[in-house]
Amino acid sequence: ASFSVVGDIMGTSMQNLHQLLQMPFGCGEQNM
């Protein structure tokens, strides 16, 4: 159970980081 919970937390954190990385780069390209 603990392993599945950790996996879910890691999965959500990775997705959030991916979205956060896409946002600044997209805005940076528009600004450039």
Swiss-Prot record:
Cross-link (Isoglutamyl cysteine thioester (Cys-Gln)): C27-Q30
Keywords from the UniProt entry: Bait region, Disulfide bond, Protease inhibitor, Secreted, Serine protease inhibitor, Thioester bond
Presence of the UniProt keyword Disulfide bond in the record: yes
GO molecular function: serine-type endopeptidase inhibitor activity
Top-rank taxon: Eukaryota
Main location: secreted
Positions of transmembrane segments: none
UniProt xrefs under PROSITE patterns: ALPHA_2_MACROGLOBULIN
Gene Ontology CC terms, in alphabetical order: extracellular space
Cell compartments where the protein resides: Secreted
Family: Belongs to the protease inhibitor I39 (alpha-2-macroglobulin) family.
PANTHER family in the record: MACROGLOBULIN / COMPLEMENT (PTHR11412), PREGNANCY ZONE PROTEIN-LIKE PROTEIN (PTHR11412:SF171)
Functional summary from the UniProt entry: Is able to inhibit all four classes of proteinases by a unique 'trapping' mechanism. This protein has a peptide stretch, called the 'bait region' which contains specific cleavage sites for different proteinases. When a proteinase cleaves the bait region, a conformational change is induced in the protein which traps the proteinase. The entrapped enzyme remains active against low molecular weight substrates (activity against high molecular weight substrates is greatly reduced).
Record text on subunit structure and interactions: Homotetramer, which consists of two pairs of disulfide-linked chains.
Protein name (Swiss-Prot/TrEMBL): Ovostatin
Native species: Anas platyrhynchos
